[in-house]
Design a protein with these regions (language model features):
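Bacterial N-terminal signal peptides that target proteins for export
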Residues: 1-8
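Small/flexible residues
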Residues: 5, 32-34, 129-130
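N-terminal signal peptide c-region/cleavage motif recognized by signal peptidases
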Residues: 17-19
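Immediate post-signal-peptide N-terminus of mature secreted/exported proteins
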Residues: 22-53
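Compact alpha-helical subdomains of small soluble proteins
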Residues: 25, 54-143
């Protein structure tokens, strides 16, 4: 279940990579990114309940998502806040590893997977400015 979730995140990140950034996404996709950050925070709390506080698996995935999406300062702050809110919400609710926390972990993974899949299926149109006529990018030597 978690492999599918992470594959979805990787797919979303791969499609979002390159010159596009989170600001280039429509509002509904930015909202999905925020929901994904929350799901990652939930998953982080639930995994730590069973694996210990040293486990940083989902936190590292969140950091990678921010790195790939390259959000502006406002959206980056919102992503981090949503991750932390998801973490806090389930950390208090599931402080120990038991059957209930494992079920919640699977549910968070399914939700995150669905969000990542929706994000990975979207395309982003990016406007690029034309390079200067005498630019090296066009194969001509700069004057």
């Amino acid at each position: 279940m978690f492999r599918l979730f992470i594959y979805g995140i990787i797919a979303a990140a791969a499609l979002a990579g390159g010159p596009a950034s989170a600001q280039d996404r429509p509002a509904d996709q930015r909202q999905r990114l925020l929901e994904l950050a929350y799901a990652l925070g939930e998953s982080h709390a639930l995994r730590q309940a069973c694996e210990g506080e040293g486990d940083q698996y989902w936190r590292a995935r969140m950091m990678r998502l921010v790195q790939v999406e390259r959000p502006g300062p406002t959206l980056e702050t919102q992503l981090r806040e949503r991750f932390n809110a998801g973490f806090v919400a389930l950390r208090g609710q599931y402080p120990a590893c038991d059957e209930a926390s494992r079920k919640a972990e699977a549910q968070a993974a399914r939700h995150g997977q669905a969000l990542a899949l929706k994000l990975s299926q979207s395309t982003i149109q990016v406007r690029r400015e034309a390079p200067a006529p005498d630019s090296v990018a066009e194969g001509e030597a700069a004057r």
